[in-house]
Design a protein with these regions (language model features):
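Acidic, His- and aromatic-enriched active-site or binding-groove loops in soluble protein domains
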Residues: 116-139
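A short acidic/small-residue loop/turn micro-motif
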Residues: 19-21
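Asp-based phosphoryl-transfer active-site loop
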Residues: 1-16, 39
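A short, hydrophobic secondary-structure junction motif
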Residues: 31, 38, 133, 139-140
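Generic intrinsically disordered, low-complexity segments enriched for polar/acidic and small residues
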Residues: 1-2, 57, 132
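Active-site phosphate-binding/coordination module
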Residues: 24-121
Length: 140
């Protein structure tokens, strides 16, 4: 049986920011019992906490399914198509929403029009200072 786990509040305790020993043992026991524990998260794989990667998970579904790994091998590493990114920009502008995609190289694809929003400008600055790439969402 395949069993999916989220990270925040399920694997990592939101109050203490730790992984309880009981959680580590439970995931190990699942594998011993023949089950396949998988992490399912909206964040990209590069952002998965190293403590989670050290656990007995056999796979990861990351970035809302844009990256899928099983037994250490990526089966899917997709980038949203230009058409999808352009549609995302169109919809986010129409409904006054912020939209962005985190990329596998640690960068961010965002609608340049929203980069002036305080939340986005802080995130863009944080990524830039970490040497991460910033891409225009609706182009290339």
């Amino acid at each position: 049986m395949v069993i999916f786990f989220d990270i925040d509040g399920t694997i990592i305790d939101e109050r203490t920011h730790t992984i309880p020993e009981s959680t580590i043992r439970a995931v190990e026991q699942l594998r011993k019992n023949g089950h396949t524990p998988i992490i399912n998260t909206g964040r990209p794989y590069f952002q998965v906490d190293s403590r989670v990667k050290e656990m007995a998970f056999q796979g990861y579904s990351c970035g809302c399914g844009m990256e899928v790994m099983l037994c250490g091998e990526f089966l899917v590493r997709a980038k949203p198509s230009l058409a999808l990114r352009q549609k995302s920009v169109e919809c986010s502008r129409r409904f006054h929403m912020l939209s962005f995609y985190e990329t596998q190289d640690g960068g961010i694809l965002l609608d340049g029009e929203h980069s002036v929003h305080p939340l986005m400008s802080r995130e863009v600055e944080r990524l830039r200072s970490a040497g991460r790439p910033i891409y225009e969402l609706a182009q290339t």
